[in-house]
Amino acid sequence: MLGSPFEPQCGDRLSWPREKAVADANVELVAPLDCHTGENPLWCEERRLLLFVDIPRGVIYGYDPATAKCDVIVRTRVTGGFTLQEDGSLLLFQDGCIAVLAKNGTVSEGARNACPGNERFNDVIADPEGRVFAGTLGGGKGRLLRFDTDGSVTEMMRGIGCANGMGFTPDLSGMYFTDSFARRIYLFDYDRRSGNLSKKRTFAKIPRKIGLPDGMTVDAEGFVWTALWYGGRLQRYTPKGKLEREIFFPAKQTSSITFGGPGLHEMYVTTAANSEPDPLQPPGYDVTMHRGGGLYRTTTEGVTGRPEFRSRVHFAP
């Protein structure tokens, strides 16, 4: 661990031309790292930091837009994702267990054996009531779990190829969920009081030839943004599931997206340098192209984000 953790030392190509799709977007590499699998970008408003993780290396970074510095927050074990707790700590969903990164930099175990040995956590999100929905992956037998604020866990879904990006509709009546291997973003009815999900249906399906849907977020207008692994782009969908625009990146393995910065006007995008062979690569995928590993920032006129919810999950000692 280096220093204090919070004080650092859907469809085919668009019908319009590519130039129009990205005309108002400025893409810049703000942290030229070599993350194996950069993921889980999350804006911390109190500390004005963009937090993200390199999953297999267990390194959590903090990027400060004011100084343009990116520092290591903590080095820990494999971490599939994390949430910001209401008290300012981080809840780390790791390979088999859940840990807490306190504001003073100490890491303590929260829940042991939270995920079986053949699974690991891959993407997580806090809901409006402080629960956490946590997806897992493991040999095509991944699950979606819900951790309530008392630490109890409920299995919401099983048989998932690769659990990934999640988000909520602005009226909090629906929850989006991504299965990357199925190349689909699903929409559920969401009951805020109970945390239950129902009426699963396909919101968007991504053609294999352009990549896999990975991390996602929902903007202030209720439009859905998804990062396409292998696709080197973000896609924005209307609340009706219609592809509205694309923003292209020089890195092919765009992995996740969040809004951050003043007024949540900036989009931060993680990427991955991972070069392992994958049968899910699109036909004709050029393995010589730049995959990624760094953190990118982009803006597009008139688009802003919404603050992410804080978790309030606590585990008995």
Task: For each feature predicted by the language model, list its residue ranges.
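Blade-level signature of beta-propeller repeat domains, shared across WD40, Kelch, NHL, RCC1
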Residues: 260-317
